[in-house]
């Protein structure tokens, strides 16, 4: 490409192409196409669905591979088109074309950044869907309110990305907010993406529940686990589980159901407890609770086999220790990740789901730590 009058845009475009080329080498489009061909052939076998678990595994892998290749090919076309647009701006000294190219350049940089982060999601479970549990910690009613704020933040984040979610369980506090909430994010790489959110979150603000208007510090814990697939072999003997049924409850402990549709499963050997109440029937709640319990037990099993996986669930005590992010609303406004040092002053935006930069920084921080440990 000849020299042009817009050197800043040209340098940015060259850097963009270099970044893309490095990502393409990591993802390896040719290898992806071969995988897709093999998986497509397997998916076309007439008796595949005689084994539903194997069929789900094949179709899930095929969908993930096709999605990754589609993103790569779309970016290829967009970068090629941008290069043509920049050449047009150069040859005709067209400022309108330059403005259009500059806008597309910014959009492409963001798309490339997102794809680059995907290349860092290479953990055993990173491609899985995720189950997220938020629990209020120290701080009384403010902590319960904070837990509800975090639930909204993550649901808004998923909505921004078009990721389907399902709230599986909510346990309301007496005065306001939530004791705990569990929801599922049904998207590829949801676990790898959200697992960096696991840990203790801290809120500092003037309490709306304090008549004297004092500043209050409160905490909530976020746990993230990969959702089990039918191909994972986790058999739980019936005598290892205690089943309790009760009526679903709403804010303030008010019953929202006239039947005992809510289900609590307790895995006696490990003490793991899972409650579900948001489905319409006891049968549906039990099925959802069983799947989440299996997911937690699978993760526990893997953690026992490999001590390095202890950090996967991020099941921590929500108090002063082990904090990963602070949300300060008073006396100043700042959200800061204590691991990556990433911080922003737009607290309302963050609490409305604008957390991509925090997640990206967390994934890069985790990848750097893994590389340093190797």
From Swiss-Prot:
Compartment(s): Cytoplasm
PTM comment text: Methylated by PrmC. Methylation increases the termination efficiency of RF2.
Organism of derivation: Renibacterium salmoninarum (strain ATCC 33209 / DSM 20767 / JCM 11484 / NBRC 15589 / NCIMB 2235)
InterPro entries: PCRF, Pep_chain_release_fac_I, Pep_chain_release_fac_I_sf, PrfB
Top-level lineage group: Bacteria
PANTHER family found in the cross-reference section: CLASS I PEPTIDE CHAIN RELEASE FACTOR, PEPTIDE CHAIN RELEASE FACTOR 2
The protein, known as: Peptide chain release factor 2
GO function terms (MF aspect): translation release factor activity, codon specific
UniProt keyword annotations, A-Z: Cytoplasm, Methylation, Protein biosynthesis
Bilayer-crossing regions: none
Record bears the keyword Methyltransferase: no
Any one annotated GO CC term: cytoplasm
Modified residues (N5-methylglutamine): 254
Function: Peptide chain release factor 2 directs the termination of translation in response to the peptide chain termination codons UGA and UAA.
Classification via Pfam families: PCRF (PF03462), RF-1 (PF00472)
Family: Belongs to the prokaryotic/mitochondrial release factor family.
SUPFAM superfamilies in the cross-refs: Release factor
């Amino acid at each position: 490409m000849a020299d042009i009058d817009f050197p800043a845009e040209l340098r940015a475009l060259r850097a963009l192409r270099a970044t893309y080329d490095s990502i393409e080498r990591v993802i390896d489009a040719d290898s992806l196409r071969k995988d897709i061909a093999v998986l497509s052939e397997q998916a076309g076998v007439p008796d595949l669905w005689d084994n539903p678990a194997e069929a789900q595994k094949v179709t899930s892998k095929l969908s993930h591979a096709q999605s990754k290749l589609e993103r790569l090919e779309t970016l290829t076309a967009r970068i090629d088109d941008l290069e043509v647009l920049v050449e047009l701006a150069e040859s005709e000294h067209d400022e309108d074309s330059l403005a259009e190219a500059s806008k597309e350049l910014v959009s492409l940089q963001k798309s490339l950044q997102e794809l680059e982060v995907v290349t860092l999601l290479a953990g055993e479970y990173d491609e899985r869907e995720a189950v997220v549990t938020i629990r209020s910690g120290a701080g009384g009613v403010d902590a319960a309110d904070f837990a509800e704020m975090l639930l909204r933040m993550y649901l808004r984040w998923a909505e921004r990305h078009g990721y389907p979610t399902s709230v599986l369980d909510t346990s309301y506090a007496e005065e306001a907010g939530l004791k705990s909430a569990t929801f599922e994010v049904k998207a590829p790489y949801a676990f790898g993406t959200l697992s960096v959110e696991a840990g203790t979150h801290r809120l500092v603000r003037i309490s709306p529940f304090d008549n004297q208007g004092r500043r209050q510090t409160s905490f909530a814990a976020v746990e993230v686990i990969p959702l089990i697939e039918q191909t994972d072999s986790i058999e739980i003997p019936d005598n290892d589980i205690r089943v309790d049924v009760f009526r679903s409850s709403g804010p303030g402990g008010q019953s929202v159901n006239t039947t005992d549709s809510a289900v609590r499963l307790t895995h006696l050997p490990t003490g793991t407890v899972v409650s579900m109440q948001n489905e319409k029937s006891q049968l549906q709640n039990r099925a959802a609770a069983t799947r989440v319990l299996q997911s937690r037990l699978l993760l526990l099993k893997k953690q026992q086999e490999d001590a390095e996986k202890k950090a996967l669930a991020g099941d921590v005590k929500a108090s002063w220790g082990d904090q990963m992010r602070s949300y300060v609303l008073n006396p100043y406004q700042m959200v800061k990740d204590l691991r990556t040092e990433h911080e922003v002053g737009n607290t309302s935006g963050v609490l409305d789901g604008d957390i991509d930069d925090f997640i990206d920084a967390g994934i890069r921080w985790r990848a750097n730590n893994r590389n340093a440990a190797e």
